[in-house]
Swiss-Prot record:
Amino acids binding Mg(2+): D482, D488
Lineage: Bacteria, Pseudomonadati, Pseudomonadota, Alphaproteobacteria, Rickettsiales
EC number(s) reported in the record: 2.7.7.8
Listed CDD domains: KH-I_PNPase, RNase_PH_PNPase_1, RNase_PH_PNPase_2
Catalytic activity: RNA(n+1) + phosphate = RNA(n) + a ribonucleoside 5'-diphosphate
Keyword Nucleotidyltransferase: yes
Source organism per UniProt: Wolbachia pipientis wMel
GO biological process: mRNA catabolic process; RNA processing
Protein name according to UniProt: Polyribonucleotide nucleotidyltransferase
Limits of the KH domain: 549-608
Ranges of Basic and acidic residues composition bias in the record: 702-714
Record family assignment: Belongs to the polyribonucleotide nucleotidyltransferase family.
Region (Disordered): 698-757
Record SUPFAM superfamilies: Eukaryotic type KH-domain (KH-domain type I), Nucleic acid-binding proteins, Ribonuclease PH domain 2-like, Ribosomal protein S5 domain 2-like
Role of this protein: Involved in mRNA degradation. Catalyzes the phosphorolysis of single-stranded polyribonucleotides processively in the 3'- to 5'-direction.
Amino acid sequence: MFKIIKKSIEWGGRALSLETGKIARQAHGSVVVNYGDTSVLVTVVRKKKEESVDFLPLNVQFIAKSYAMGKIPGGFFKREGKPSDRETLISRVIDRSIRPLFPEGFHDEISVVCNLLTYDTVNPPEVPALIGAVAALAISGVPFHFTIAGVMVGCDENNNYILNPSVQEMKASSLDLFLSGDENSILMVESEVKELSEENVFNAIKFGHEHLKPVIKLIKEFADTIGNKPESFAPIDASDITQELEKYGKDFEKAYSQTVKQERVQALEAIRENILNTLKETGKDEKLITYAVKNFERSLVREIIRKKSVRIDGRKHDEIRQIEVEVDILSKTHGSALFTRGNTQALVVTALGTTQDEQIVDDIEGDRREHFMLHYNFPSFAVGETSAARAPGRREIGHGKLAWKAIHPVLPDKSEFPYTIRVVSEILESDGSSSMATVCGTSLALMDTGVPIKAPVAGIAMGLIKDKDEYVILSDILGDEDYLGDMDFKVAGTSEGVTALQMDMKISGISFEIVEKSLEQAKAGRLHILEKMNAVISEHSDDVKDHAPRMLSFYIDKDKISAAIGSKGKNIRSVCERSNAKIEIGDDGKVSVFATSGTEAEIAKSMMIDSITELEQGSIVDVKVVRIEKSIVELEFLNGRKGKMHISEVANEHIDSIESVLKQDDTFKALVIDFEKGGCPKLSRRRVDQETGEFFEGELYNEERKDGPNDRDNYYNNSFSRKPGGSHHKRPPRPHSGFSNRNRPKFGNNDSSSGFY
């Protein structure tokens, strides 16, 4: 029933196999790729183009369902919903690798679906998914005449490169590099780097490319065995129209010389509309005219740049647009920056939060928490267009993740800066390199916020104009240069090294020479941008803004964690409610306190310490009146514990009633005199100097007792002495806290203990 064809090799210490003929046989191309114990099913389906389509409707989807990891989806709905960010990013990597390899003018609809069948949580699925996509295209009959492969590269602590590192190896790696290419050239690069030099990054690319060759050979042998050759595709012939367009060359050249984007766009649209109306009258097809005009413009601009060494806006090939930098422009945010480069502008805003604000990510490796989030928004008005607001698309997710990768290596360790950080980049204008403007703006906004980043980060987008062996590398490309050029190579980093890379091609690949020179030229541009940024702000603020949440942390004994939390969270909830703060307790005993002010944070800290500390006779505590009876006052500690005080201990003088001195909700300092059998503290107000908060050393008023034999005698049935040798009575023994009230550190004015509800 099945005609199975399978090819395999040993690659990177693991078996890599391609198999077809058993699964998904109705697709035009179907391949199961196994790498280690990770398996991906890739299918390709082709649909003949619609008449109105004048672009390549390529749709790439990577799908990772939870069964592949042996899990059931969490939450109320037990079925997968919209694609995760990880799925979207893998889909983009595959799309960017294969899209440039389809012939120009081929507009059939192509669907590439990569289903993760099983995942061993060791071998990431990106590599087998791309390999499977290329293999499935190669056997589908689609006019796809190039054979490429993908590879991941890591770098260990000894600067040794790792081929296809495991998930665990990648966690300790200073490099996370994914690249694709054929035997002779590089096609796509995506990377996060921990400030490695351009030389190290270039060598990593060469290392990865060298290990692509066995896989490319495997795919070719696999396709040859099946024998379904790609069909030929004749390019569109619009030579007769192109000849008629020559007379519009000067008009296009003048329009493209406009440095203001809006003026340039208006001038170009006027010329195109004139050409379309003129040639339609001669009977020419509208789609053919549009196709010919596009190619004519592309050839014209590329020739001007290559031969005259002058770019669209008059800059030299390595010149950066004018840069304007502002910080702290939004008064009530935790940090903000406005970064403008030419006609590209990013408003970047930061917000600080607690661990409770972290993003819980349901990833294929399992749930994890992200304390740094970067969200990129690209509204339609940024390019002068109208469009309804919608959820972030693939492009916005991809650009945001690239900026995240650029900034992530310079963020402080969470133990140093425990805030959760959210960054939002609003692109207000765009004429190329908006993702790199986001990188620059994020670095500025974080420093304005007071985040102790290791170094400022800047980003730049490099372009390429290539004609056979001649080429020109462009720094800080415009949107039109991206559209008409051959490469979009984004490089971000500090003055010391690279932190992120992303390279996309519109041709079938570039040489190592171009890659190396692009990295060198990008470094010069990056240093120039950093100089402009550092002139405004070069170091992080000493502290977070006044209206930002205040944070402090301290440690408690691990055996006190349960007491600090309390039964069903009663203690920590009580402290949070009373102090107006947020408190988080880690498994290691670390307590993080977040409050709107430093004073509130200190109060919460003191209350938490008090709630787990032994309360002893002689302690001076803060209390509040909660109920007044005839001769007894019921008091409450700041952490919620209750105590009692007799009328004779209210004032150092005779009083007829408690209400003459105290009323409901009054607060004061009291001395712990003794404990009832049940552990309830007996308190005294008159034995504390209310101005200094210290033990009252003066003479105490002593009148003849007028209470009955079962009143005061039963309540204060023991004498109290501050002197050594005095009769100090404690409540029933409890587990020791590690502190004594006399010797423990002074955490605040609240030296009480609680934890008993």
